[in-house]
């Protein structure tokens, strides 16, 4: 994989774009791994001349797996409420539902027509969704009835729609975690290829803003990433969890019998995970957290981690519940955000249609 440029600060005329699927109320891993960074970028963009953030609920992407319509409708509103609760401000950022802006799908088709099957075949996300190995390809599905029944075009072409999400708004910066950089690389490749085909630099090739925080792992099984879809609810902490639920889940988190708090020992994945959570919440480093708590017992350290999480999430949880109860206001915010997004997206598509010969106006 080619090395992507990393950006640590915004310059004038910057545009930040990112989305999150409405697969349930976000957990602390979502917050520390990406959403907290969104708020920081929003504030930085507000201080940077002619800069703008576009954040959206990626509901079209969520349809690559079956959804119950009633639950899905609520999940979309819950995610919007969660984004507002963590500090995304519609006065500073454009906040909207992806499905409310038809130009996402329109641009995805244009990009799909210049994206090779080989490029998509090399993507790892659709393989991980089907529990395949990174080196597997489409031919493997012919021999795997189980995988092929769960495989659809939407899942395979997911990265093309994601590229459209980014390129539609002239994104200059994309905040991502370490495991998502492959899709940004593909987006950059698609943009360069499209520009080359039409001999005009019409699509902006975005740079990456890499979140340096360590991945947050499952509390009871720290060898795997924290996930809302985990059947064991003890493995994750939701932004809406109560104080009691947070303390109970942290107290039951996997640790070990080794005395003292140390960081980096591969034999202590549970302690490493708790240190990473504590460090990300307190804007510190794992080594500093370990050093400051070196003499603590595991139980004492868990209590400190619980208290730090509660201080961080309690105002978010309160705000989330307030937003969640005001469905009409949520719809108004989404509608206004969609109008802003459509205005931007329409301008981009008009230029692209003119360039590709689709427009006669």
From Swiss-Prot:
Q: Where does L-tryptophan bind?
A: 165
The keyword Translocase belongs to this UniProt entry's keyword annotation: no
MF terms (GO), sorted A to Z: ATP binding; tryptophan-tRNA ligase activity
**PROSITE patterns linked:** AA_TRNA_LIGASE_I (PS00178)
Q: Look up the domain of life of the source.
A: Eukaryota
Residues bound to ATP are 21, 27-30, 177-179, 225-229
Residue positions of motif 'HIGH' region: 22-30
What Gene3D superfamilies has UniProt attached to this entry? HUPs, Tyrosyl-Transfer RNA Synthetase
- Give residue numbers for sequence motif 'KMSKS' region: 225-229
Q: Which Pfam families match?
A: tRNA-synt_1b (PF00579)
> What positions does the transit peptide occupy in this chain?
1-16
What family is this? Answer: Belongs to the class-I aminoacyl-tRNA synthetase family.
Q: What subunit structure does UniProt give? A: Homodimer.
The protein depicted here goes by the name Tryptophan--tRNA ligase, mitochondrial
Q: Which organism is it from?
A: Schizosaccharomyces pombe (strain 972 / ATCC 24843)
